[in-house]
Structure formats: C-alpha cells, structure tokens
Amino acid sequence: MTEHLKQKLNDSAVLRWSVLALVAFTMLCGYFLTDVMSPLKPMLEKELLWDSLDYGFFTSAYGWFNVFLLMLIFGGIILDKMGVRFTGIGACLLMVFGCGLKYYAISTTFPEGAMLFGFKTQVTLAALGYAIFGVGVEIAGITVSKIIVKWFKGKEMALAMGLEMATARIGTTLAMVLTVPLADFFGCLLYTSPSPRDQRGS
C-alpha cells in the first residue's frame, strides 16, 4: 500500500518538480552560507582585526568533522538506516545551529586578548560553527541526491540532478555578489556591540 502510494505520488509531475524546487532551494541557501564569508575577508580584517592566519583557520573548519571524523560516511549510513526525512531534517538543524553559532561569534565582541585553542575566542567559535554547518550542508547534499533518485526515473533523473546543482551554485554567485552590499547596507557585519577597532580607538 505504501509503495503503491509512493508510485502514485511519483507519477505526478507537479509533485516531482515541486520536490526538486524545494531541495534545490535548500542547497542554494546552503551554498550561499558556505561562501558568504569569503567576500567579507577585508571587512573582517578591518572591523574585527582578523589576520590571514585567523581567516585560514576559519575556512579550514569546513572540513574538520567531515574529513577527520568521517561524518559524511556516518551521514550516509544514517541516511540508509533512517531515511531521507530524518536525515534531511537533522542536516538542516545542523546547518541552522552552525550558522547561529557563527553569527553569535561574529556579532559579539569578546575581551581583547581572549584566546581559545591558540586563536582569538571569536575566531575559534566562528570556526566551530562553520565546522558544524559544514557537516549539515554536506549531509544535506547526499540526502538531496537520494531524494532525486526516489522521485525521478529514466531520462528525467540526470536533468533533475543538473538543475539541482545549477540552482545550488546560484547560491555561490549570490554570496559573491550580494554579501558586501548587504553588509554595507545593514552596517558592517550587523554588530550588536562595538567592534574591536572601535574599542581600540576609544
């Protein structure tokens, strides 16, 4: 009965392409947030007094858990055992939590000289958030692939995968084009407290 219902749902072109639009938009947001800090590097150096070592440490965090803790492999196992709904929701929650931690780190002024694991506390917390986000977005990527395989068959499958990847990469383009204008419009990096530069000048 369940398989029959799934087959009926798959037969609906409207539902198939709506599902594709939903998962493609999710990955667009994921790719946008993956690359959103890259155009802000000069602003991070100017406003938060980051240096290239800090920024390099931060960007390396994306692969910490995925590479050294084999989270993509575990994510695939969870996907096979628990299904796309559980894994997809879990991946999105990791993305949201990671982004929230990164935003907290960037928007909070920590005491000057505060260090954590050899780096500024702000940098370390932002990197940790980025690492958690990286797990979420990569697991979301493999979940999306399985969703497409479930909903599309034959010649439509390759087209669906191509459209999903193309849409996701629009997120990277939007990050490069919109991030700096948005930061300028909202006032630097949406600070809720004075930046280290302002504190140093006062």
Regions found by a protein language model. Give the residues of each.
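Glycine-rich segments within core transmembrane alpha-helices of 12-TM secondary carriers
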Residues: G162-M176
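Extracytoplasmic
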Residues: S18-V19, F25-L44
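Cytoplasmic helix-loop-helix junction between adjacent transmembrane helices
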Residues: A131-A166
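Central cavity-lining transmembrane alpha-helices of secondary-active solute carriers
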Residues: S60-G76
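C-terminal ends and interior cores of transmembrane alpha-helices
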Residues: L93-G118
